[in-house]
Amino acid sequence: ECFCYDKKMAGFAAQEHIAEFKDGKCPVQLMVMKCDKFKGKGFDAFLMSQMWDCQEDRERIFRECKYQVVATDMLAAALPALERANLDADFLEALAELYPTCEAFYFQSCGKLFLAEDVRSHQIEGSDRFIRFGVNVRFFNIEGTEDMLIDTVGMSPLFLPALQYHFHNMAPNW
């Protein structure tokens, strides 16, 4: 249900997803901001190096894409983790349908970049969609050692912990 619409944004109440607080309940809100110019700035070499799902296209996307639409959920932190994961994945799929000429999706909470076609054509179901699109597994070489580190980023919207694995003397491409 659309509860606000103007030149700057549109807001939708997700009536099937009710956030409960100690002083009341209300539907989670899904917000879509207006289309703005995109300049591809603010993404340093480190952020881009961790965009594993779009390595071949990321530089072209940042160079050629001229517009962006920002979308977010509000009040969804009050939902159980699995419900929020499914809501956010459903929202992503709705945005992919709503913007058929969209070329890519960027997830600020985890730093992942996907071609829009990958979002539109996936066969993943349920909350696994959130893991696929909203959680990034990053790889680091620890300077001055032969150690490596793998960590995750993106579970915080669900209030779940990140994972971190530290490897000693292991070939990363086994």
PLM-predicted stretches and their roles:
Residues 1, 80, 170-174:
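Alpha-helix capping and helix-coil boundary motifs
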Residues 1-60:
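N-terminal low-complexity, intrinsically disordered segments
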Residues 32, 69, 170-174:
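Generic hydrophobic, helix-prone segments enriched in Leu/Val/Ile
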Residues 35-136:
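Internal, hydrophobic cores of structured domains that mediate oligomerization or house catalytic pockets
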Residues 107-174:
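Aromatic/basic-lined ligand-recognition segments
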